[in-house]
């Protein structure tokens, strides 16, 4: 990506402003995402197993350190985790939908009424929904945050068109499929049961209604795989940006990995609202 912009500007050996800004912005963005990841994992394990966030955070950081400090381990772990977690989550959601088919019309009615209703429009509800959708959409896929080209640039394929189609499919799977699965799980639970809840507590309470304690544990395990694979992925992206800015040497590469682990630790023990507000910024 950086080389493309340098060639575009006719300066192959000099760093141009746009490529430098891209690299810096990416690193800042990924630091925020690291905190959101660990915070979600610790919250889910607290709800499922009543484990204090500090203990979960320490274990998470240790596991991450063992993996990221080993050369070429990132992609190998991702190749194993991502397909398994996506399929399992999708299958469980289909089971919940099929066991609650009678409630589906009411779910879709509620979605459209609360998003586009007259009361919501007058009260500014549509703008709030749109704003939250944009902010959370940045975390559901990478097209909005601008980091998707990092994955496309590293892909090995015989045509850029194929790479583009794969990236488009990734947005569809992440946002339309996976996020819709989460929405169905929560909306198919009784409204009075989840009233006033948010974050992991909301999702796991809804899953407990559908599948009992197994559902709560399943969400914790699945979220761990989702979050951990995302963390490893952003480290893979950050590696190229760090190498571009500071050189591909042991000091710079180790430094950014240590910083990522520190952010992972801070996010795990920080308050939910603080982490998400920082991530939104």
Residues covered by each model-derived region:
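Helix-loop-helix module between adjacent transmembrane segments
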Residues: 2-67, 221-232, 248-251, 266
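Small-residue-rich segments of transmembrane alpha-helices in multi-pass membrane proteins
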Residues: 82-95, 175-179, 253-264
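Select transmembrane alpha-helical segments in multipass membrane proteins
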Residues: 10-28, 58-59, 120-140, 177-180, ...
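Extracellular/periplasmic helix-exit of transmembrane alpha-helices
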Residues: 94-110, 124, 154-157, 169-200
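Flexible loop linkers connecting adjacent transmembrane helices
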Residues: 1-12, 192-211, 240-246
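A generic transmembrane alpha-helix motif of multi-pass inner-membrane proteins
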Residues: 252-281
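Helix-loop junctions at the membrane interface of multi-pass solute transporters
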Residues: 2-3, 26, 65-66, 137-160, ...
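Membrane-interface loop-to-helix entry segments
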Residues: 18, 22, 26, 39-45, ...
């Amino acid at each position: 990506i950086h080389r493309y912009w340098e060639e575009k500007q006719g300066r192959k050996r000099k760093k141009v402003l746009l490529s430098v800004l891209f690299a810096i912005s990416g690193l800042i963005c990924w630091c925020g995402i690291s905190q959101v990841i660990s915070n979600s994992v610790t919250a889910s394990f607290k709800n499922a197993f009543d484990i204090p966030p500090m203990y979960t955070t320490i274990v998470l950081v240790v596991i991450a350190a063992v993996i990221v400090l080993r050369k070429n381990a990132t992609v190998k772990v991702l190749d194993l985790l991502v397909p398994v977690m996506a399929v399992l989550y999708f299958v469980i959601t289909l089971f919940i939908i099929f066991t609650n088919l009678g409630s589906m019309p009411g779910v879709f009615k509620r979605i459209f009424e609360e998003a586009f209703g007259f009361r919501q429009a007058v009260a500014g509800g549509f703008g709030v929904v749109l704003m939250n959708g944009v902010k959370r959409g940045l975390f559901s896929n990478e097209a909005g945050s601008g980091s998707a080209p990092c994955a496309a640039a590293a892909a090995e394929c015989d045509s850029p068109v194929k790479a583009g189609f794969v990236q488009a499919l990734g947005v569809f799977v992440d946002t339309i499929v996976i996020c819709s699965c989460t929405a169905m799980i929560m909306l198919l639970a009784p409204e009075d049961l989840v009233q006033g809840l948010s974050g992991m507590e909301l999702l796991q309470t809804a899953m407990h209604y559908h599948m009992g304690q197994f559902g709560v544990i399943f969400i914790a395990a699945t979220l761990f795989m989702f979050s951990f694979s995302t963390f490893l992925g952003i480290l893979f992206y950050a590696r190229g940006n760090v190498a571009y800015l500071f050189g591909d040497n042991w000091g710079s590469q180790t430094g950014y990995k240590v910083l990522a682990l520190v952010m992972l630790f801070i996010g795990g023990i920080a308050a939910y609202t603080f982490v998400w507000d920082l991530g939104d910024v």
